[in-house]
Amino acid sequence: MEPRSSERQRGASRPGGYRTEHALAVDASARIPGFRPEPPRSLEELALPFSFVAELVLKIMYFNGNILGRDIAARACLPWSITSDALNFLASEGYCGTTGIRGTAGPGADFAESLQYLVTSLGRERARELLELNQYAGPAPVHLDDYLESARSLVDEAPTVARDQLREALSHLVVPDELVDILGTALTSRQALFLYGPPGNGKSSIAEACAGVLGDPIFIPHALYVHGEVIRLFDPVHHRPVSGPPLTHDQRWVLVYRPVIHAGGELRGNELELAFDRSLGFYEAPLQLKANGGIFHVDDFGRQMIPPRQILNRLIVPLESGIDYLNVARAGTTVSVPYATMLVLSTNLDPGELIDEAFLRRVRYKAHVPDPSADQFRLIFERVCRSQGLAHSSRAVEYLLERHYHPTGRPLRGCHPRDLVGQLVATARYLGVPPELSPDLIDRVCRAYFSDIRPSSTAHVGGNARTLN
């Protein structure tokens, strides 16, 4: 299919895509961001080659059989005027035809929206040729230039984080005041943050909660168009759409809450680069790009399959310059994109054995997440009991501390109340007795939870870093 001479040529005409359906809507409590993509009124505003659009529409029809015109437009997330042009072109080439009408067009709608379209045998042959190149058949991608405009607005319009706002976001956690203030200044500056300290004290929960103060929901594209290639950006695993009444906007974009992208010990080096899926024929965005506008949290730092230095070397340039460089190998080019995410590293290993001085300087904020004090432990225990519908007993908590902590010098961990109460409820259910903080149930749970196993300080660690106790 040859592009029209009047089309806006920004890149080679190459097919791409994946299948998805997404209705965009807004939670009544969520504020609409300043950047709001308007629906394209023409092919020029769409900024995609006409041949790409026509090929995308053909693949959508191929995968869906007999399909209404308006449903094709909805799946492609395109206005009917642009979809109609593509359908007329495909029909003139003998790739599709109409099989009848179903329903009626709404007020002001085009009659052709209610027509049913079906791919011809010639069209199926052409679609299979296109699918050998790539199998993308989802929402039309957004041109990289249009995405860059939105990403820059994330940097330019970053709001200041107020102390009361942060305290509210962390209200479900027990966090020392000094730590709250370090978090607040780091979030306001959007500079990298290193959380370190013993395991089980809420470093991951803190990172998750911090995303709530980064600002209003943001629009992100389903996918990007870069030099004829498609990069899938919206990820239902990591991005949470805002729900509510539908918005009038460019449907190629999704309104999502500020993302928190977690990467733990399973993180691999290729997840920080554009990943080309040979079976599908298009790219998957790297994790840090998916995290733009939110937080990229590398949890259990130092326990990945790749050395800490490799992760740091990959991210050091974006941290320093605010620009990330992505290699689009199939197009033979490298593109630059704004690095508009806040990097949060968390570990229970000794940071001094993981990071050299040069990188430590670039991670501007370092915060120690300590074990809770005895009073904080009691408060956490009370909150957990309340959340589990369990009657709280101060005397039972003192029994727990005196019997199972003080004699052995066992450290208090923020996760212990949740874990112990959860196991106590399960134990009571198994025994057929009421769940209560009785000495017998507490002793049973502690015998199962605590053990004589001495954890290794370097097990599954990329190096010989010490575990913090």
Question: What are the language-model segments listed below?
Answer:
Residues G352-L354, V369-P417, Y430-P435:
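Conserved C-terminal "switch" segment of AAA+ ATPases
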Residues R152-V180, L390, P407-T408:
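Dynamic helix-loop-helix/coil hinge segments at AAA+ ATPase domain boundaries and subdomain interfaces
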Residues A91-G103:
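A short, conserved structural fragment
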Residues D350-R362:
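Short regulatory helix/loop adjacent to the ATP-binding pocket of P-loop NTPases
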Residues F63-R75:
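Short acidic, hydrophobic short linear motifs in intrinsically disordered regions
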Residues S171-V344:
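Conserved ASCE/P-loop NTPase catalytic core
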Residues E44, P107-T160, S451-V461:
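Short, amphipathic alpha-helical interaction segments positioned at domain boundaries
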Residues S438-N469:
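C-terminal engagement/docking regions of AAA+ P-loop ATPases
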